[in-house]
């Protein structure tokens, strides 16, 4: 099975959206294999968002991500990266379709509730930044046989 990294950002945590977001992924049939709340250290924010280091918005992004607890997760499922990206919607909540996480819960591009890996390669890198292999759990959901065609 494929894996992806998902992070509910401080605005999503502080607005009480964790349960609703997790429920959407579970209802889709995805499997949560790791999760924890954490205020990210600066070093991991820099590593996570290395592609944005030279951009003018990076200092405010870093401050925002470090401004409260995030909920870090690893989800598993077939084509999970693409599925989660569709479920979260466009980066700018004002452009995100209704029914997507950002379309329903996001307000501003600078406070867009959630981050998810954009490729399998990014997923592997981001999971490695935030989780040790021993923190990823293997188990079978009781509904896997009806979620996936084998």
Swiss-Prot record:
Coiled coil: none annotated. GO terms for molecular function: ATP binding; metal ion binding; nucleoside diphosphate kinase activity. PROSITE patterns: NDPK, NDPK_LIKE. Signal peptide: none annotated. One of its GO terms (cellular component) is cytoplasm. It catalyses: a 2'-deoxyribonucleoside 5'-diphosphate + ATP = a 2'-deoxyribonucleoside 5'-triphosphate + ADP; a ribonucleoside 5'-diphosphate + ATP = a ribonucleoside 5'-triphosphate + ADP. Keywords: ATP-binding, Cytoplasm, Kinase, Magnesium, Metal-binding, Nucleotide metabolism, Nucleotide-binding, Phosphoprotein, Transferase. GO terms for biological process: CTP biosynthetic process; GTP biosynthetic process; UTP biosynthetic process. The keyword Transmembrane helix does not apply. Its cofactor is Mg(2+). It is found in: Cytoplasm. The active site is at residue 115. Its EC number is 2.7.4.6. Pfam families: NDK (PF00334). Major role in the synthesis of nucleoside triphosphates other than ATP. The ATP gamma phosphate is transferred to the NDP beta phosphate via a ping-pong mechanism, using a phosphorylated active-site intermediate. Belongs to the NDK family. This is Nucleoside diphosphate kinase. It comes from Methanoregula boonei (strain DSM 21154 / JCM 14090 / 6A8). The gene is ndk.
């Amino acid at each position: 099975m494929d894996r992806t990294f998902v992070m509910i950002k401080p605005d999503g945590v502080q607005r009480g959206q964790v349960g609703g977001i997790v429920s959407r992924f579970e209802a889709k049939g995805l499997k949560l294999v790791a999760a924890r709340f954490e205020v990210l250290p600066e070093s991991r924010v820099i590593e996570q968002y290395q592609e944005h280091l030279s951009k003018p918005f990076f200092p405010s992004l870093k401050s925002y991500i470090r401004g409260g607890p995030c909920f870090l997760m690893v989800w598993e499922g077939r084509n999970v990266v693409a599925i989660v990206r569709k479920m979260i919607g466009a980066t700018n909540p004002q452009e995100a379709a209704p029914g997507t996480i950002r379309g329903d819960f996001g307000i501003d591009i600078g406070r867009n509730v959630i981050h998810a890996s954009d490729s399998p390669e990014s997923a592997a890198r981001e999971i490695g930044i935030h989780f040790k292999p021993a923190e990823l759990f293997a188990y079978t959901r009781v509904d896997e046989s009806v979620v996936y065609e084998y």
